[in-house]
Regions:
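Transmembrane helix-loop-helix
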Residues: 1-7
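Transmembrane alpha-helical segments of multi-pass small-molecule transport proteins
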Residues: 7-13
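Functional transmembrane core segments of multi-pass inner-membrane proteins
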Residues: 13-120, 163-171
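Hydrophobic cores of alpha-helical transmembrane segments in multi-pass inner/ER membrane proteins
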Residues: 38-39, 70-72, 146-155
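Hydrophobic transmembrane alpha-helices of multi-pass small-molecule transporters
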Residues: 44, 98, 122-129, 150
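Membrane-embedded alpha-helical segments of multi-pass transporters/permeases
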Residues: 45, 75, 126-130, 154-158
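Interfacial loop-to-transmembrane junctions
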Residues: 91-93, 127-152
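C-terminal domain-closing interface element
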Residues: 148-172
């Protein structure tokens, strides 16, 4: 459907500058995250309500819930890390980007995105540390991993990622 293709182009076009800004400046601009979240909810509503009012309401609720879970979850992890190790483990921009992705991808898509982002960040961080390019306490951005994970989930879908990540068994 053309509307889903348009939504995909919009999402990917929105994630690219966020990825690049975070890589360069370790910063995710809140206005870009906020507008991206609203665009995600708007596209979700348009696509959902085209399938009927009940579907539209359910889909919009699901994606709103995912955005809220992302925001609270990421801010909670950051606050817990600050309490345990004396500094936040994530920037608040990461929480806002995760909320944006929840608005676009829903709970399942958000979960897959986070798994991909954590794995990607761990691999790149480990390589950076082992190669000496990343210092022991040197921060590096997590936003690009979230953005790339979200893009991968949008492009290949849940059915591709869930079995690959071992989160569900093969379909009979």
């Amino acid at each position: 459907e053309w509307l889903v293709v348009l939504a995909g182009w919009l999402l990917l076009s929105w994630l690219l500058p966020l990825l690049l800004i975070d890589l360069d400046y370790l910063w995710l601009p809140e206005p870009l995250c906020r507008v991206g979240l609203l665009l995600g909810l708007g596209m979700t509503a348009i696509i959902g309500f085209q399938q009927g009012e009940a579907v539209g309401r359910a889909l919009l609720f699901h994606h709103l819930l995912a955005a809220g879970v992302a925001l609270v979850g990421f801010e909670g992890v950051s606050a817990l890390a600050e309490r345990l190790i004396g500094k936040p483990a994530l920037g608040l921009g990461d929480a806002k980007l995760a909320a944006l992705l929840g608005a676009w991808l829903g709970l399942t898509g958000l979960g897959i995105t986070v798994v991909l982002a954590v794995f990607g960040g761990a691999v790149v961080g480990s390589i950076g540390r082992l190669s000496g390019r990343l210092g022991r306490h040197q921060p590096f951005p997590f936003g690009p991993f979230l953005a790339a994970g979200g893009a991968a989930v949008w492009l290949w879908g849940h059915d591709f990622w869930l079995p690959l990540l071992g989160l569900v068994g093969p379909t009979p």
